[in-house]
Amino acid sequence: MSTAKKPLLEVRDLKQHFPITSGALLQKQVGAIRAVDGISFDVYPGETLGIVGESGCGKSTTVRSIAQLYKPTSGSVVFDGIDLVKADQKTMLKARRDIQMIFQDPYASLDPRMTVRSIIAEPLVIYNNRKLLDKPLSALDIERKVENLMERVGLNKAFKNRYP
């Protein structure tokens, strides 16, 4: 990727370790599970990142750590210029509007009763209804955003009324 473009997402030396404890009452840490141990990568505007690997290798933990659903043990996650590891709750809520995760099983992630358009529009509609967007979106605004997102990831707009 050209160095002239700035990454949209920068992950540096991300680590997510979970403590192993012994004893029921006075729990003492006796070790740690190193679920994610020092990964780094960049994602540039227009790119899509797929994380693949064996079951239990840390794919979901990596994504949850990036989205700050788990507080990383160490490392940095910078999304659109915002250091998510150091972000306050309000900043994190705003950043999560732009972060999308689709986990391993597409049949569990994508509702087969919803059209592609409805699936893509769902977060926009929820945030719009809860008045969490900077400005309210009309139905036409949402439709345009759905088509723009489909175009950005290489999905033909003709698929928007199909089911996954």
Language model segments and positions:
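ABC-family P-loop ATPase nucleotide-binding domain
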Residues: M1-A32
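The feature captures the beta-strand-to-loop junction immediately N-terminal to the Walker
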Residues: V52-G53
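Helix-to-loop junction immediately C-terminal to a conserved catalytic motif
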Residues: A67
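Conserved ABC transporter NBD signature motif
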Residues: G75-D83, A95
